[in-house]
Amino acid sequence: MNGEGTGIGAPTPALAGFLGKSKDRNASPGNCPWCLAKGQTNALRFYAVNLKETVLLCTNAVCLYPLVSRSLEEVRASLSKGGCKRSISSLPDISDDSCPPKRPREEKLDVLADVSEPCDAEVNDATLPDDTVKTQTFTDQQSAPAETISLDKTEEQPVSIEDIKEQPISHDATEGQPISIDQTEEQPVSILHTEEQPIVLDLIEVKPMSVDHSEEQPICIDNTKERPVSIVHTEEQSIVLDLFEVKPMSIAHTEEKPTSFDHIEEKPMSIAHTEEKPVSLVHTEDQHLSIDQTEEQPISIDPTEEQQPEELPAVSDEDVDLCERKEDCVSSTQDEMEEEVLESSSELVPVHSELFWKNEENMCWLDAMLVMLVHCRTIRGTPCRGIKLSDKLATVPCNDSVVWKLCWRYDKTCAYLQARKKQSEDKVLRVPAGVLVEAERRLSALRLSVFKLLQPTLKCEIGQQETPVFALPLLLRSDKWAQDIFQHTIRWEFKCTCCDFTVNESVEKTLTTLTCIVKDWHPLKANNRTQCNKCEHKNQRRKMVLEKLSSVFALHFVEGLPRKDLTKYGFTFQGFQYSVSTIIQYNKHLQHFVTWVRQSNGFWLELDDLKHPYSPTHKRLPFPSSEFHILFWETDSFKEEHSEVCLPTAPPEVPNAPDEHPPKLSDSVATDTCVISALTVEDTTASSIADTSIGSTTLLDTFEGLTHKDIVTLTLVNSESPKNEPRPMRPGFVSAPRHCPFEASNLLSGIPKTGSRLSTPPIPQKSSLVHKPEVAAAAVSKTHLQPTSLFQRHPSFQSTPIRPPPPLPPAPKPKPSLQYDKHEDLPVKPADMFGGFKTKKLANSQPKQISLPGGLNPSVKKTAGQEPISTTEALRLKLMKKLKAKKKKLAKLNQLLGNGGESVAKPDSTALSSPYSVTSSTTTYDSFDDQFLADLLSPATTVSNLSPDSTGLLEMLNNGQNGEQQNPAVATLAPEATLTCSSSTISPLDEYMQSGMCHTALENADFNSLDIFF
């Protein structure tokens, strides 16, 4: 079709005619009637369909003539009737703007057709539109001395060019010769057609050309060496004519099988030239007289080319034809032009470290796949025909492998760019702008060649969305060498729980797709949910078992992975360690693919064609695990696995359960630091559950939020633990060896000082004081320090002791515990209400019982003859004694009230200082006392304001303590009545408690601190 150049630099014919017969010989092309109806003027031209048929089309690319609503008869009737003679016109002066753009390789040839029989009538130029290209006419009646070509034709004979004798064929139209042909448009020579199918000419090699006539092969063009090269000079231009000889050309049929011209049965055309006359061409300005056609590019005709959009971009001369695996044929002229372009580009532009493809035509799926292939370590380390990509011998591409050749071309482009880098004054690497453009052009040619290779099988189109899930297996299928690198064998195991349908089959794939994987998915435990093919029951489990793996293992996850930590997906198979090296991310929102390559330092290199040319690195993957689309595992040796940095996608895994093989610490590791670490790793949740003792900070928590009907019961619980049974270690502890030579003083010196104290809420659970083994106590006694005084030195051990789980047997040592019947969550109290309960002396507070590593736990025995009792223990025992004494005194008061028969006015409890303003009542072991105390301490008739802040009971206990300072056997009950009770009424247990209380130095000071609330 017209508008396409031949690439040889010479002008092309103005229009294409037909070689067959025309029934309507008098019909002139004229103007398009359909365009004339719209007020436009466009010429009609004939285009050959085959040797006998032509089609008349409008030169306007938008016009659909003759495919219009009017009938063909009406259209032909509207055509102007003129002379019998057809004109092939051309403009004498053709500007460069009128010529369509040149394309280096993919040039489509049009058909140059002549009229079968000329006529005498001349065509009136008035019938042609103004923009019609004027040419001279062919006639067999005209004669020009020594410069005419006679066409001896009849209607029955096919068109043929007879022997041209003593006449040169000239393209110079400046002298107005009627026989010369002026090629003003970039039209190729011609395409011959047979009766059955068109014949496509395929230029094979470019050599000096001459045409010789042969009777046996009239269509075959033979080579001669006697054709001289002539130079034609005109007034306006001086052109050097380079004539190239062409080897016998082949005819490409529609089945893409090359044939020779001998297969044409009718032999309609024969070309003969004399050996005496040269052939000269006139070259116009800015046109090159060189034929640049490669072996691989067949040329065909498309009559509707002007009306069809171009599907594929033009392929440059540097395009690598991976489909046929042949080398490029680049002319020396183009190399010289390329050098001139690169030398002329003096502007330096910065260049980035990574060279990859830029996003064009929505081809991110292909860019992501190509980036993965060129950055694959296994592909670069695997030899093809004994040559690796990293070897110096890899100067010639391996034509047996498409992937190997792709990587080789990529490396060659990178080396081309690297060799031209220049460091500027600002220490930034720069290259000439033309060099960078050339490198990007080569990458585009590589991508286009791979696209052409995938197009027949993938059925992909430019601008159409595709996925590497389908493209990668198809590409590897065409490359046996690369397919062996990605090939793996897996076995699917499936058994339906409903119909017992089982599947056990092995398959070989290069990319396996997984859907609906479980949360604990792992390559060695690859379970996913699927549907039974027999009963169609869903949520059935199918297991993937690895049987054989190659160097690269690729999996496609439709929903992504459940976890982002890629270290959990590394595995060992048949003595090889596999780790994730490359990820192809798929962003569903953008419908975009991005490739992430793990570097040797553990960082991830982002290669996003939308961010071209920038390729940032990331310490962690900045996208969720649900976008893990395709993962590639590559083999690593065990030595490399231990030496390389862990993947930075997540912190190292901390085991939350005891391992089968606990870690062993050497003697050199057993220092004070590791011992302190073992001591401080305590479970606060477990300690809060096990601790039910009454401390100075938990005393007020006990009475918080209690209503008037709550019953508080104080009981004594005896717990006992076997002396030979050590305290069980927690899973998070790291036990040190028993022979670890550390001192208690060094142990405490490494603990940071802090004033924080744990406040544990009371729960109705029994607690006990655990006696540690005697061996542990003996080991600690070497320091000549008592355990109690040792741990009292630091405030971190002053909180309530941590208790073991309840299943341990009770200890014989009695220990009171606070228990309440109503198990409800108590409301939170303001912290400023309990300032008086804080200990004033830090050194005398209750030590925190801890478990030393290896069972080195001291034995703490609280007797009257040993160390003084701590503040918490003294407070608890004192409250016990006072409550029992108040119970007995209240019983005496009840008897007096009953005997007197008179009612005593109950005091008002609205004041916070009132001893009757309490939040709960105490009870003893009989129901009579419970009812009496409830009536006495919670008067319903006189109470107007009962607040949880009322602590009159504690004030009453404190007043009793003050009275006991003079006489321990006498206690004060209330301001209304004071009763005395002899010491004989006190039980032996109270006497034992009193004897223990005599040894504490904090007896008065600590209890006087309760006065703040009263």
UniProtKB/Swiss-Prot annotation:
Its EC number is 3.4.22.-. Residues 275-289 have a biased composition (Basic and acidic residues). Residues 802-815 have a biased composition (Pro residues). SUPFAM superfamilies: Cysteine proteinases (SSF54001). One of its GO terms (biological process) is protein localization to Cajal body. Residues 355-636 form the USP domain. Its main location: nucleus. Residues 137-158, 275-318, 794-823, 844-867 are annotated as: Disordered. It is found in: Nucleus, Cajal body. Belongs to the peptidase C19 family. SUMO-specific isopeptidase involved in protein desumoylation. Specifically binds SUMO proteins with a higher affinity for sumo2 and sumo3 which it cleaves more efficiently. Also able to process full-length SUMO proteins to their mature forms. Plays a key role in RNA polymerase-II-mediated snRNA transcription in the Cajal bodies. Is a component of complexes that can bind to U snRNA genes. This is SUMO-specific isopeptidase USPL1. It comes from Danio rerio. The gene is uspl1.
